[in-house]
Amino acid sequence: MSSIAPDRPTDAASPHYSRSLLLLLATIAGVSVANIYYNQPLLDSFRAAFPDHASWIGAIPTATQLGYAAGMFLLAPLGDRFDRRLLILLQIAGLSVALVAAAAAPSLTVLAAASLAIGVLATIAQQAVPFAAEIAPPAARGQAVGTVMSGLLIGILLARTAAGFVAEYFGWRAVFGASVAALVALAAVIVLRLPKSSPTSTLPYGKLLGSMWHLAAELRGLREASLTGAAIFAAFSAFWPVLTLLLAGAPFHLGPQAAGLFGIVGAAGALAAPYAGRVADKRGPRAIISLAIALVALSFVIFALSGASIAGLVIGVIVLDVGVQAAQISNQSRIYALKPDARSRVNTVYMVCYFIGGALGSSAGVAAWRAFGWTGMCAAGLAFAALAGASHLRGGKRGG
C-alpha cells in the first residue's frame, strides 16, 4: 500500500551479526520482559498486604499485561523510525522509576497504577527481537529470532522463580528493588556493547502508528498469526496466576517460592526455541505451529487429569511451555518475512494482539478458578487452545 511509504527496504545481514550480540539481545529481552511477570507468584503476598482489596488482586497482572500491550502500540513502532539502542536505554530509565513506585506502593490502587506503567515501559524486548531479525541474514533469521526469544521466555519463566525466592526471604517489595539493580547493570553493558540500529522509515509518529492499521489490513498472514498467537498466549496466561493460588491453598499450602520453582521447570521450553527456529527456516513454520497448538491443548488435558498433583503440574508445565515457545518462534518467523522494511510495526501488531490475549487469559483464568476451581481453569485453557487451532486451520485453507 502506498500509504505505508516512505520506507527503505532492508533484508541484508548486518556486519555486526554475531553470536555474542544475539546473546546480549537475548539478555535484554529476558531481563526486561521479566518485569511483567514478577507479580504473578506474589499474588498471595499482595492479598496479605492489602486484605481490604483481596478480591481485586487479579487486577495486578491484568494491568501489567494491558500496559505491555499499550506500550507495544505506542513505543515499539519507534524502532522503525529511531535508533533502537537509544530507545532501549530511555525505556530502561523510565522502567526503573516505575519499579521504584511499585516497591513503595502504599495501596493496591497505587500498585496497580505502577504495574500499568511497568507494562508500558517493559516493552524493551520488542526492540530486541526485531533488532535480531534486522541484523541476521535471511537464511538464519528464524534461528536468530529463536535465540533472542529463548532469552525472552527464560526471562518470563525465571522471573517467577526469582520473585518467589526474593519474596520468601526479603518480602515482595524487595523484588521490584532487585529488578532496578539488574536494569542498571544491563544499561552499562548496552552502552559498551550494543551497536546503533539503522532506521528504516521516515514517517512522522502519527503516520507511523496509523500505518499499522494498513499493514494489518494488507497482510492476511499477519492477521492470522496475531489471532493464533493471542489465543495461545491467553491459554498460557490463564494457567500461571492460578498456579500461585492453587499452591497457596489445600492440600499444598506452599508459598511464593514454590510457585517460582515452577519457572525453572518451565524454562525447559526455552530449549526448544533455537531448534524450532531452525526447523521453521528449513521446513516452513505452519507444521510447527500445528504441533505447538496440539501441545498446548495436551498440557491442559494433563492438568485436568492429574488432579492438581505436583507430578502432573511438572509434566504439564513442560508441555505447555514447549508448545507456547515453538508457536511464538514460528509465528514471528512468518511475520518478519512479510514486510522487511516495517518489522517493528509488523511485530507491534502481532505483539499487541498477543498481550491483549494474555490479559484476557489472566482474567479468564482467575475468574474460572474462582467460579469452578481447577477444572474451570483447565476448561478455559482448552477453549483458548481450540480458538488458536481454528484460526490456524482457517488460515491454512486460505493459503495464509
Residue spans for each PLM region:
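Juxtamembrane intracellular "pre-TM" segments in multi-pass secondary transporters
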Residues: D7-H16, L194-S226
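Conserved MFS/SLC helix-loop-helix module at the cytosolic interface between two early adjacent transmembrane helices
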Residues: A70-L108
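Helix-to-loop junctions at the C-terminal end of transmembrane segments
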Residues: M72-D83, L271-P285, W369
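Structural signature of the two symmetry-related core transmembrane helices
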Residues: L86-V100, A287-I302, L382
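Cytoplasmic helix-loop-helix junction between adjacent transmembrane helices
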Residues: A114-L152
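Intracellular juxtamembrane helix-capping segments at the cytosolic ends
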Residues: I124-A136, A326-K339
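Helix-loop-helix hairpin linking two adjacent transmembrane segments in secondary transporters
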Residues: T147-L192
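C-terminal transmembrane helical hairpin of 12-TM major facilitator-type secondary transporters
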Residues: R286-N331
